Amino acid sequence: SQMEPLKKLLTLLGYRLVTCEGFEADDILGTLAKACEENGNECVIATGDRDSLQLVSDKTSVHLCSNKQDILYTPEKILEAYGVTPKELIEIKAIQGDTSDNIPGVAGIGPKGAGDLIQRYHTVEYIYDHLDELEIKDGVRKKLTASKENAILSRMLGEINCNAPVDTNVENYV
C-alpha cells in the first residue's frame, strides 16, 4: 500500500497522524475543529470533501480544494452558494441522498427539490412532523412518505460525528 510510506514521510516531516478505530477521517476533523473552537481558536480545514462544509461556523472555515477551483467557505459563503446554513447542508443531503457515501435519501427528490424543501422548512424532522400541513405538491409528499425511514437514516449517516475519542488538546498539534 502507498499509505504506509506516506504516513512515515508525514511523521518525519513533523505532522501528527490521528486515527481512531470505528471513526472516519471526517469525524476526526470535526472533533478537532470543535476542540479548536472550544479553545477560542479559529480553524481552517483544507479538504476536497464537500461533506466538511457542514462544519463551517463563525470560527471554522473550509478551504474546498479541487482541480477546477479553490473556495474558502464561511457561513456567509455557504448561504450565498446554497441558500442554507452549514448545518442545513446535512438536511439537504438526507433528502437528496449521496451514492458516493451510500446515503439513500428520498427516492425521486434530487438536489434542487431537496434544497427547496430545506430552504422552506429547515430540517428533515420538521418536514416529517408537519408532512400533512406542508404546502408541497402531492407527488413530493408521496415520495417523502414512501422514503421516511431512508430520510431519517440518511440524516443520521450524513452528519459528521464531532465527538470522536481522540486527543483534543490543541497544543499537541502545533
Task: Go through each PLM region and give its residues.
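Cytoplasmic/organellar membrane-interface segments at the starts of transmembrane helices
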Residues: N172-V174
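Extended two-metal-dependent nuclease catalytic cores across DNA- and RNA-processing enzymes
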Residues: S1-T168
